[in-house]
């Protein structure tokens, strides 16, 4: 077994020549010159080898140095393998050459010791004799016998944990052997960890275990400690002062020690049971999150370096009058605040105080604020002077009855018009229409204000579901009434009841066939629990504003019914009807996309009116069978005749061009395929799996990644991150291409076999 106290060869630093320090550490300088030698999956391991070679530990031997060079050669692309040389000009000479064959790092061993040269510096080491080593080891009080400590830790393990502790020890041995600085002990079900871990470890990850505590005497040079999702109830006051970042989210911590690591810069304690914070938090702290705890008050003086403070979802009734001067983000939503400090930090950019009890905002807010969320409070007015940098303000669900008179003249500093969201406030319909006319004028350059139509002063009483259904199905038998009464226990049944009552007040009830349509649909819902569950969910927010939102929700329910029928086999023997159903869903998706474009260009207009307006007005020209005929507020939707003409043309062109590809990837069609052509479906899926599991997929990814020629960054970690992001994006793109090819092929074959392939031809002339 490996024992760190049983060392075969050691060295001591003898002399340094050319000692002028460089701005870039040697390991980074070398890495920046050779990072292109390695693929993205080998970058981290190669970087660790370079770090070791630039600063060999005192235990380095020729064999260990050689093993690192051999490892680098194996990891490198074949074209660069010869740039990493060992046994060059002698058994104990090693070097790395840059792309232009310039020597950038060399290590030379001799009988006296070894020399490391790189970056214009030369460091020489001499070996310690065996007797010196023995004397040093016997006289050292700090030598740690890791194997003894770890073996005892494994012996103490409960039976169900023993195997995972062995796995943890293997990972720690690997860190020792390969000089790794990151130790991952995630998801091992550990109830404790040993106090002694390899001293070179700077990142310790203990997430998703069953730890109830951390060691009081945790050793090492840890800079980053993650112990999220455990069962911790406290934090030792003796954690290493080297820790700079600590995440202990989703635990059971009830209090913090008065002393935390002095170097701590980032502390995340999301979802614990903390009731108060220590008065003296570390002065270096920059990020503090105690989101979702039970804190009632904050210290009067928080560290001055904090730039991000998240105290959301606690029990705070007030914030400190003096907040850190450099604070840029303050998240204090879901508390019991009734006011804000009179003076907020001058550099504040993000302020979230939503879901509180605030009645008034400071008349002057910091001009640097770009994002302001004061929704779900008790505000009756907004400040006349909004922050100059404001980009988005969320003020929904307050008691606002008017907007600042200065609002139309406000000019934000951002590249886009400021968005001010004031939905679900008690504005009158007349006030909303006046604002819409003002903000829709040609020369208007003020903020874009979003609101919801409707009279919010009306309070509706939600009836029991069976009574709401009887309003549509007047001749229900007692047995049917009892059936709907039983459905009242299902999730969101009350929301659906309110929806039905509100639907009866919409413009569409003027048409007799509308009631017949709804009645038939309700009878279907009574027989289909899965469809009923989907419809009840859609009803959740259907009645929170105007009747047009109710109508839009009804459209969504009809669309969901159509998809449900396709998935459950209603069209298995009627593929022509399935394709027509798919065409309707495709057209509705296109309408939604165009409506979103229109919403971006309008001011003071409820987006519900825009979405419903396009659906309603294009109902006949696009043969939309699931859409109703009428809506109430089309006159304030902002949609013009030219908008409708353009939308119709664009949607028909898109359908002729793209429906074939869209239908091939449509989920309900796949469900039909599995039922009507199970053998062909299995063969196609096997072919798809083969594409992924063989070299074809990775070869295509590598080829496109190579074409990108991602430039090296002076920040090696940043370069690796960019390459990983690019590889992920390319992988998704290629997977989509593979899916499109295979799903299109099987679609064409099955439709041809069923003699309905002509239905995929261009629909519009």
From Swiss-Prot:
Interacts with host TXN. Ubiquitinated in the presence of host E1 ubiquitin-activating enzyme, E2 ubiquitin-conjugating enzyme and ubiquitin. Signal peptide: none annotated. Belongs to the LRR-containing bacterial E3 ligase family. Its EC number is 2.3.2.27. Keywords: Host cytoplasm, Leucine-rich repeat, Repeat, Secreted, Transferase, Ubl conjugation, Ubl conjugation pathway, Virulence. Residues 454-461 are annotated as: Linker. It catalyses: S-ubiquitinyl-[E2 ubiquitin-conjugating enzyme]-L-cysteine + [acceptor protein]-L-lysine = [E2 ubiquitin-conjugating enzyme]-L-cysteine + N(6)-ubiquitinyl-[acceptor protein]-L-lysine. Residues 464-758 form the NEL domain. This is E3 ubiquitin-protein ligase SlrP. InterPro entries: Leu-rich_rpt, Leu-rich_rpt_typical-subtyp, LRR-bact_E3_ubiq_ligases, LRR_dom_sf, LRR_E3_ligase_N, NEL_dom.
């Amino acid at each position: 077994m490996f024992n760190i106290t049983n060392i075969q060869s050691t060295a001591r630093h003898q002399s340094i020549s050319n000692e002028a320090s460089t701005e870039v550490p040697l390991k980074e300088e070398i890495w920046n010159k050779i990072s292109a030698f390695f693929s993205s999956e080998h970058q981290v391991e190669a970087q660790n080898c370079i770090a070791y070679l630039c600063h060999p530990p005192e235990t380095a031997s020729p064999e260990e140095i050689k093993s690192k060079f051999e490892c680098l050669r194996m990891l490198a692309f074949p074209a660069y393998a010869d740039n990493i040389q060992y046994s060059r000009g002698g058994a104990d000479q090693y070097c790395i050459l840059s792309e232009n064959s310039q020597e950038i790092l060399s290590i030379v061993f001799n009988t006296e010791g070894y020399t490391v040269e790189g970056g214009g510096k030369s460091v020489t080491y001499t070996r310690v004799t065996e007797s010196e080593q023995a004397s040093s080891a016997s006289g050292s009080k700090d030598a740690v016998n890791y194997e003894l400590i770890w073996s005892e830790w494994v012996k103490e393990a409960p039976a169900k944990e023993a195997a995972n502790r062995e796995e943890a020890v293997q990972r720690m041995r690997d860190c020792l052997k390969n000089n790794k600085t990151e130790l991952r002990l995630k998801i091992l079900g550990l109830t404790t960890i040993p106090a002694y871990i390899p001293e070179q470890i700077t990142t310790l990850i203990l997430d998703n275990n069953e730890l109830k505590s951390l060691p009081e005497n945790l050793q090492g040079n840890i800079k980053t400690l993650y112990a999220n999702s455990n069962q911790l109830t406290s934090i030792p006051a003796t954690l290493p002062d080297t820790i700079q970042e600590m995440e202990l989210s989703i635990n059971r911590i009830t209090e913090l020690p008065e002393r935390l690591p002095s170097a701590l810069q980032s502390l995340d304690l999301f979802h614990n049971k903390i009731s108060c914070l220590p008065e003296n938090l570390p002065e270096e702290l920059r990020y503090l999150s105690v989101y979702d705890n039970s804190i009632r008050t904050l210290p009067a003086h928080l560290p001055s370096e904090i730039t991000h403070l998240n105290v959301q979802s606690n029990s705070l009734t007030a914030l400190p009058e003096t907040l850190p001067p450099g604070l840029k983000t303050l998240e204090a939503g879901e508390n019991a605040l009734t006011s804000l400090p009179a003076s907020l930090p001058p550099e504040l950019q993000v302020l979230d105080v939503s879901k509180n009890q605030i009645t008034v905002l400071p008349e002057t807010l910091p001009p640097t604020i770009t994002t302001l969320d004061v929704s779900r409070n008790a505000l009756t007015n907004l400040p006349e002077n909004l922050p100059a940098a404001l980009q988005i303000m969320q003020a929904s669900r307050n008691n606002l009855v008017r907007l600042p008179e200065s609002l139309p003249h406000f000019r934000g500093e951002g590249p886009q018009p400021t968005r001010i969201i004031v939905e679900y406030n008690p504005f009158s319909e007349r006030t909303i229409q006046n604002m819409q006319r003002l903000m829709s004028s040609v020369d208007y350059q003020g903020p874009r204000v979003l609101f919801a139509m409707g009279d919010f002063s009306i309070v509706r009483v939600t009836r029991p579901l069976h009574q709401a259904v009887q309003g549509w199905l007047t001749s229900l038998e007692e047995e049917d009434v009892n059936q709907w009464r039983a459905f009242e226990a299902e999730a969101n049944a009350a929301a659906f009841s309110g929806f039905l009552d509100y639907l009866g007040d919409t413009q569409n009830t003027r048409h007799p066939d509308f009631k017949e349509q709804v009645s038939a649909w309700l009878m279907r819902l009574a027989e289909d629990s899965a469809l009923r569950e989907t419809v009840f969910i859609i009803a959740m927010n259907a009645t929170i504003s105007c009747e047009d939102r109710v109508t839009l929700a009804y459209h969504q329910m009809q669309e969901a019914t159509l998809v449900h029928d396709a998935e459950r086999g209603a069209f298995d023997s009627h593929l022509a009807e399935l394709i027509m159903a798919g065409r309707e869903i495709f057209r509705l998706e296109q309408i939604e996309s165009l409506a979103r474009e229109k919403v971006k260009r309008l001011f003071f207009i409820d987006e519900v009116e825009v979405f419903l307006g396009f659906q309603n007005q294009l109902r006949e020209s696009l043969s939309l069978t699931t859409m109703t005929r009428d809506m109430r507020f089309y006159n304030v939707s902002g949609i013009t005749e030219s908008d409708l003409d353009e939308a119709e043309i664009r949607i028909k062109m898109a359908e002729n061009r793209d429906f074939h590809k869209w239908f091939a990837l449509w989920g309900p069609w796949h469900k039909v395929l599995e039922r009507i052509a199970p053998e062909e479906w299995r063969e196609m899926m096997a072919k798809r799996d083969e594409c992924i599991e063989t070299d074809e997929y990775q070869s295509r990814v590598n080829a496109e990644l190579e074409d990108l020629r991602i430039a090296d960054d002076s920040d090696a970690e940043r370069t690796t991150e960019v390459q990983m992001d690019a590889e992920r994006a390319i992988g998704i793109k290629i997977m989509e291409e593979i899916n499109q090819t295979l799903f299109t092929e099987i679609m064409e074959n099955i439709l041809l076999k069923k003699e309905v392939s002509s239905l995929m031809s261009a629909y519009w002339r």
